[in-house]
Amino acid sequence: GDYLSEQRLFAEVLGWKISGAIDIQKTEADGSITIMDYKCTSVWSIIFGKDSWAKQLNFYAWLVRQCKGVPVNKLQIVAVLRDWKQSEAKFKPDYPKSGIVIVDVPLWSTSQQDDFVTERVALHQQAEKDYVFDKPIAPCTEDERWARKSKHAVMKKGRKKAVKLHDSEEEAVAHCEVLGAGHTVDFRKGESIRCSQYCDVSAFCSQWKKENADG
């Protein structure tokens, strides 16, 4: 089929103009489109899957439908695995067999796509109104913040890598006592990766400020 790369499409929802830049649009023999997106990611993203990929690519499918009136029948991630190891691939059955993997992403119904896009735009519009009128803004979820939870690491003297990570201090201390002398518990504070590294407005965000003040 024909390939179209890096096209940005625009559409209007609830009076707002929104857009998305699609890495690859492949036109199939039946005239439908396959959307492909490139990601440099970890092996664990492939093993466990990422909900954010489904949201992103279904939004792209919605854009194509709105702008071109053409059906999208397949969504794919071309994943470049930065931490892939050939030795692991030999012995682990669920481990990716190559450093580059194509992952099929679930395609939602058109009504699901419509509802998702409208809901997200409405949330942003409500947040803007709340900010203007100095009202509390709905907080971002852990998924939206790419949050890594705080952990309690059981450490062994002379070893850099944790023996085990626990969610609670009590579990970590109990584990330490079982292991005996030479083991300690280190607290590893969680972090909202998207907020700290990728958000342009975190400096103005009350949720981000509170999270850091609590730390």
Regions found by a protein language model. Name each.
Residues 6, 21-24, 37-39, 56, ...:
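Residue-level signal for functionally critical sites in structured catalytic/ligand-binding pockets
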